[in-house]
A protein has these predicted regions:
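HIT superfamily nucleotide-processing domains
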Residues: 1-213
Length: 213
């Protein structure tokens, strides 16, 4: 078991990462984050950015952490473009307010999903989730639970009035993939996709730094 540095929670699966599990392999470690594959990899090309600090959402990052977070988003957008020939989508179920009835997160420790997927019917997703466009991450409220969605064109959306369903965005993807009964990562690991993701990210290695800016 490997404990994430800084503030942590003894009962949190992201504070104590079991490196003996393939799905917890550390693909990259930075000062403030880990990059890992994940259980429930609905597609080939699915990773998480996990905060080392035990915080409830990425809105609680300090300035230095936020800068590194944005760098990693750009870095892995471009890595996915090189590997899969298209940009990924990115989302976070931010649970800033634990007293709110609105939540879509299944693990209350800040983590962001990067997925090799583009929605077929994005207009319907935006309508049903009540997404609104934002210009930058700093605009997200620190007092409300939210879903952040960044599409393949790097357009950023936020919703504070989303359907309160655990793993909501995963459910939306699974529905389009016609595997709705397999959206829950607790029961469906997709080990082959995990292995493919690990191998392809390792194979491509580091890109030119200019690609990450």
């Amino acid at each position: 078991m490997m404990r994430i540095h800084g503030i942590y929670n003894m009962n949190c699966r992201f504070c104590f990462i079991d490196k003996s599990k393939k799905y917890n392999e550390i693909l990259e470690e930075t000062k403030y984050f880990y990059i890992t594959p994940t259980l429930g990899s609905l597609v080939d090309g699915y990773i998480l950015i996990i905060s080392k600090r035990h915080i409830n959402s990425m809105t609680l990052l300090n300035e230095e952490e936020l800068n590194e977070y944005k760098y990693l988003i750009n870095k892995y957008r471009n890595k996915f473009k090189n590997i899969y020939k298209k940009y990924p989508i990115i989302f976070e179920h931010g649970t800033t307010n634990l007293n709110s009835n609105f939540s879509a997160s299944s693990v209350v420790h800040a983590h962001t999903h990067i997925i090799n997927y583009n929605f077929y019917d994005e207009d319907n997703l935006i309508k049903n989730t009540k997404f609104k466009i934002i210009n930058k991450l700093e605009e997200i409220s620190k007092n409300k639970n939210y879903i952040l969605y960044i599409n393949q064109n790097n357009k950023k959306y936020i919703s504070y009035e989303f359907p309160s369903i655990s793993q909501y965005m995963r459910m939306c993807i699974s529905k389009e993939l016609n595997i709705l009964n397999k959206y829950d990562w607790h029961d469906n690991y997709f080990e082959n996709n995990i292995n493919l993701t690990i191998n392809k990210i390792k194979e491509i290695g580091e890109l030119d730094e200019e690609n990450y800016k």
